[in-house]
């Protein structure tokens, strides 16, 4: 059952531009925190669609049929200036549908930081879901020019969702997942917003010399280009279950 779990930095909203940030759970909090740190002066409404979580093991057709109607409903209710799809899988699956319906400048997607990675290293390790990998247009545009390795895991996002506050469980799972890539010379792309929440844990396992990249800052930069930045605190409302509030309390100051 959805609930208003948290209100952060609340101030007079009549002066703020509203942004709807959408994810299946806690992953998109990485983007919310980045926007808050930029002091964009935005009214951020974060919607955690736990009813349909996780997205990572769903097909494009399933996401279109089940998630798109929910997005349309919330857009109509909340009237945001823009919506941020804070999920690589959802972006790869439905971003074109939403842009066709609402316009190019209404929808900001989240995509793996493949292009920035290619400027650093032509050998890339992608951590993502199978649906993201299969439907990522940016990846298709550069794949022939890079040496790509991939870890396509459908369970890691759910593990982070469930065990964010239990580091031992998460570390054991990450260790098994990443053990073959310790001290790798490849650039490592975190192709899921959930993974950004445990970026430091991934870094510790792979080694301090391994370059990690994700799309968080790119999303923030686009939001700022579209809506501006007035050096004021953001207001943040979280709509989701208690876990979203709990993770935000820990992650926002990490």
Regions found by a protein language model. Give the residues of each.
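Non-catalytic structural scaffold of enzyme domains
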Residues: 4-254
């Amino acid at each position: 059952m959805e609930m208003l779990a948290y209100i952060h930095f609340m101030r007079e909203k009549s002066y703020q531009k509203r942004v709807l940030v959408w994810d299946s759970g806690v992953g998109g909090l990485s983007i919310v925190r980045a926007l808050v740190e930029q002091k964009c002066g935005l009214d951020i409404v974060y919607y955690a669609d736990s009813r349909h979580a996780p997205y990572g093991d769903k097909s494009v057709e399933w996401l279109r049929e089940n998630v798109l109607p929910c997005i349309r409903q919330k857009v109509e209710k909340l009237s945001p200036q823009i919506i941020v799809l804070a999920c690589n899988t959802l972006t790869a699956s439905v971003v074109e549908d939403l842009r066709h319906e609402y316009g190019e400048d209404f929808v900001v997607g989240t995509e793996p930081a493949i292009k920035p990675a290619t400027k650093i290293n032509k050998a890339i390790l992608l951590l993502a879901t199978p649906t993201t990998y299969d439907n990522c247009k940016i990846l298709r545009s550069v794949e022939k020019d890079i040496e790509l390795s991939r870890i396509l895991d459908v369970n890691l996002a759910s593990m982070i969702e469930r065990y964010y506050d239990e580091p031992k469980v998460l570390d054991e799972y990450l260790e098994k997942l990443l053990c073959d890539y310790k001290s790798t010379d490849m650039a490592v792309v975190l192709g899921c917003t959930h993974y950004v929440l445990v970026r430091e844990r991934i870094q510790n396992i792979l080694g301090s010399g391994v370059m990690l990249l994700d799309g968080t800052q790119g999303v923030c930069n686009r939001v700022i280009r579209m809506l501006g930045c007035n050096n004021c605190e953001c207001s943040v409302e979280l709509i989701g279950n208690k876990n979203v509030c709990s993770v935000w309390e820990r992650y926002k100051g990490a």
